[in-house]
Amino acid sequence: MLNNRASGVLLHISSLPSKYGIGCFDECAYAFVDFLKEAGQHYWQILPLCPTTVGDSPYQSISTFALNEYFIDLDALCRLGYLKKEEYEDIKWFEYEDEVDYSLLYTNRHRVLYKAFDRFKRNIPNDFNSFCEQNSYWLDDYALFCAVKDYFGGEPFYYWNEDIKYREELAIEEYINICNERILYYKMLQYFAFSQWLGLKKYAFDNGISIIGDMPIYVAGDSADVWANREIFKLDSNLEASD
């Protein structure tokens, strides 16, 4: 890949133009690929695509495997019949058009995406189960983590009830049942995000543009990665990061 001299541009997905609060995998992303090709560029460098939470930094994510649901193209969901235009066009997405308002984005994106979920669960796509199976090594823990986090009002996992905090087997089964629909919702978000991201990557590759990614080398202390793999992290007795 790097044997020949070539140039490119660093532009994170979030910095692409958008009417809906933040840059995403929409027509502007495809137009940027066209721009790079016309400008004689060969590389598009991006930052980590993982979900952001407190601090809104991709270097402090709740998962190093998942994609950020903010990057889902709402227009694409509309074309597929999961959304209606009026369900997301008339929403206030930001205070200033040149700035991302993460508070508004969090509230409004999930409100809109849950409307898509209401339609999705009535007619689940044929390839959804295979997506979940192929990514089960991280997706199951991630979706459960997000769902249980919602159940506890967004509290860090080390403040949850002791049984689920320490991932006791019976507690895992109990919360899978309690949060079943919410788990499916978070899996759906990843299904949409990965489908759109892979489509954009293929378009870039077909047009001679290679994407240089960035590794999310720091995980948040309150993350699915730490919760599901606490034996490989330096934690105190309460499962918080140890000095």
Give the predicted meaning of each segment.
Residues 2-230:
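Acidic/aromatic-lined carbohydrate-recognition and catalytic surfaces
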Residues 223-243:
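Metal-dependent catalytic core segments for phosphate chemistry
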